[in-house]
Amino acid sequence: MAMIPFPVIDPVATGANICRLRKDRGLTVRDLQSYFGFEEPQAIYKWQRGQSLPSVDNLYALSALLQVPMNEIIIPTSHIVSFEQQAAVCCS
């Protein structure tokens, strides 16, 4: 059984990175709330705490706002899984 690295996003580290990048650009949570058109800022706070991740569309927009590529926002981690385990996740 072959073992391969399976990339996984670290939500807590990614959230901390979103917070850092936002602050580095001099933006507030309210600025992001307004940019995304959210009625409340809770989604931004959840991203920053790692309780949820932005959708792909929101991640793409966030990268434009922060002026960084999407892969500089996401903090990965790796888990080693077998091909069979990966196939079960991807193809079920």
In which residue ranges do the predicted regions lie?
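Residues within the helices of the helix-turn-helix
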Residues: 19, 30, 60
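Short, charged recognition helix plus adjacent turn
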Residues: 2-8, 64, 74-92
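DNA major-groove recognition helix of helix-turn-helix/homeodomain DNA-binding modules
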Residues: 57-72
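Residue-level signal for the short linker/turn that defines the boundary of a DNA-recognition helix
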Residues: 16, 27, 39, 54-57
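DNA major-groove recognition helix of helix-turn-helix
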Residues: 47-48, 58, 77
